[in-house]
Regions:
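Metal-associated gating/positioning segment near the N- to mid-region
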Residues: 54-120
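Active-site core of metal-dependent hydrolases
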Residues: 187-296, 303-304
C-alpha cells in the first residue's frame, strides 16, 4: 500500500471532537492521519491520491484492551504448552488479538511459576510487532490455601510478604513499569483458577500504612500507580492511598463511586471476571459513566467466564480473551445508548479511554489529525452493533493493513 492515501466510508466514528462523519474520509501519510473531513472536501484537496473506498463498512479507531496477561499466564491457560513452546503460544495469542481488532494492549508482568519472563527481551520483541504493547510491572498474591506471592522482579520464585513491601524490590518494580496496571494486588487474586483451588482469594494483603507508602513511592518517582482490587474494604483502601487507576473495582458501592470521582480515579472494568467477586455488571458500568468517571473496559485475558451471569451469556467456561472484548462490552454499551449517550462517547470505553489508561491518548484511540492511523473497518459499531470478530473486516496499524478478511 502507498505511504499516502485516502480512505473513505459512508460512516466514520472518530471518538474525537469531530464526532461521527457521514460520507467522510481520512488522509493517511506515513502511518499518521494528516487530514480528516467530508469526502468531497478531502477529494478536492488531494486529487492525486489513491482512494480506498470502504463503502458501507464503518470506520472506527482500532480497539484497545488495556488489561491483559498474554505473555505470562495466558499461554499455559489456553494451550498445553511447555517452556519450549511458550513463545509460540504468545505469538498465537497476539495474532488472535489483532484478528479481534485490537492493536494496543496493556500487559501485566507479575512473575509466574509457569514461565520465567525476560522483560527486556519481550519489550524488544514487542517493538517488532504491528501493535502497541505497554507493560505494567507488578507484585501479585494468589489466593491458594497457602498464599503465593510473586513479583515481576523475582520471576518464578515465590516470596514472602516482606518482599512485597521491600523498598529495593519496589524501586525496581516502579522503574520498570510503563503504565499503572495491577502494580499492587490489594486482594489476593483467584487468577484464572477454579474457585475451590483458591479459597483465600479476596483476602486483604496490605495494611493501609503499607499501601500508602507504596503509592507514595510511585508518585515520588513521577509515576502513576494502579491496583487490583475488589470489595468495599479494599476499594476504600485504594482511594485512601491515592491510587490513580483501579482495575476491576468489583463490588463498588454508590458511595465509593462518588469518592472515586472526587479523587479523579480512572477505573478499568472487567465484566469477564478477575477477582473473588462477581464482575462489573452493565448497571455498574452505567452508574460509573453517569457519575463522570473515566472507565475503560478490558478483558483481563485469559479468564474462564461465569456462565451464570446474564450479561456474559457464554455457553461454556473455557478461557476467553480479546476476541470477546466487544461481547463483554455490549450490554453496558447498550445501556449507555438507552441513557442517551453519543456513540463516540460509548465507543471510547474500548478505544480512547484505554489509551488514557496506557498514557497513549495523544497517539492512539481516536481518529484526528496527528494520531496514528490505527483503525478498523467493520460491519457495524464495535461492541454496540457488532460483537462477532468476523464482522471486523480489516485492521490497520500505522496506516498498514495487518488483518484483511476481505
Amino acid at each position: 500500500m502507498d505511504n499516502k492515501y485516502i480512505v473513505k466510508s459512508s460512516k466514520i466514528i472518530t471518538v474525537s471532537d469531530i464526532k461521527t462523519l457521514y460520507n467522510g474520509a481520512i488522509v493517511v501519510s506515513d502511518g499518521i492521519i494528516i487530514d480528516i473531513g467530508k469526502y468531497d472536501e478531502i477529494e478536492s484537496k488531494y486529487k492525486d491520491l489513491k482512494v480506498i473506498d470502504f463503502k458501507d463498512l464503518v470506520i472506527t479507531p482500532s480497539l484497545i484492551d488495556c488489561h491483559t496477561h498474554l505473555f505470562e499466564y495466558a499461554p499455559s491457560t489456553v494451550y498445553p504448552v511447555t517452556e519450549k513452546t511458550y513463545e509460540i503460544a504468545q505469538d498465537a495469542l497476539i495474532l488472535n488479538g489483532l484478528m479481534s481488532g485490537v492493536t494496543a494492549f496493556g500487559e501485566q508482568v507479575c512473575g509466574s511459576p509457569m514461565y520465567e519472563m525476560n522483560l527486556d527481551k519481550i519489550k524488544e520483541k514487542a517493538k517488532t510487532l504491528p501493535l502497541d504493547i505497554v507493560f505494567s510491572t507488578n507484585s501479585i498474591t494468589i489466593g491458594f490455601e497457602n498464599l503465593v506471592n510473586l513479583t515481576s522482579v523475582t520471576g518464578k520464585s515465590s516470596v514472602d510478604k516482606s518482599t512485597l513491601i521491600n523498598e529495593e524490590i519496589l524501586e525496581k518494580i516502579i522503574d520498570e513499569s510503563e503504565y499503572p496496571g495491577e502494580n499492587v494486588f490489594i486482594n489476593a487474586t483467584p487468577a484464572n483458577l477454579k474457585e475451590e483451588l483458591v479459597p483465600k482469594a479476596g483476602e486483604i494483603i496490605y495494611t493501609q500504612e503499607e499501601l500508602n507508602k507504596i503509592s507514595k513511592m510511585f508518585h515520588n518517582k513521577g509515576k502513576k500507580i494502579g491496583c487490583h482490587v475488589a470489595g468495599e474494604e479494599g476499594i476504600k483502601m485504594a482511594i485512601e492511598a491515592k491510587i490513580d487507576i483501579i482495575h476491576h473495582g468489583h463490588g463498588i458501592t454508590n458511595e465509593l463511586i462518588k469518592k472515586a470521582k472526587e479523587e479523579n480515579i480512572i477505573i478499568v472494568v472487567t465484566p469477564l471476571g478477575g477477582t473473588h467477586l462477581k464482575p462489573n455488571s452493565p448497571e455498574e458500568i452505567e452508574a460509573l459513566v453517569k457519575e463522570g468517571i473515566i472507565i475503560a473496559i478490558a478483558t483481563d485475558s485469559y479468564l474462564p467466564p461465569d456462565i451464570n451471569l446474564p450479561w456474559l451469556n457464554f455457553e461454556d467456561d473455557s478461557p476467553k480473551g480479546p476476541e470477546v472484548l466487544m461481547k463483554i462490552s455490549n450490554q453496558g454499551m447498550l445501556k449507555l445508548k438507552d441513557a442517551g449517550l453519543d456513540e463516540n462517547e460509548i465507543l471510547s470505553l474500548i478505544t480512547l479511554n484505554g489509551a488514557k489508561v496506557l498514557g497513549l491518548e495523544e497517539k492512539i484511540g481516536s481518529l484526528k489529525v496527528g494520531m496514528k492511523a490505527n483503525f478498523i473497518a467493520s460491519k457495524g459499531v464495535p461492541g454496540l452493533e457488532i460483537t462477532d470478530t468476523n464482522d471486523i473486516i480489516k485492521v490497520f496499524y500505522e496506516g498498514k493493513c495487518v488483518i484483511d478478511k476481505k
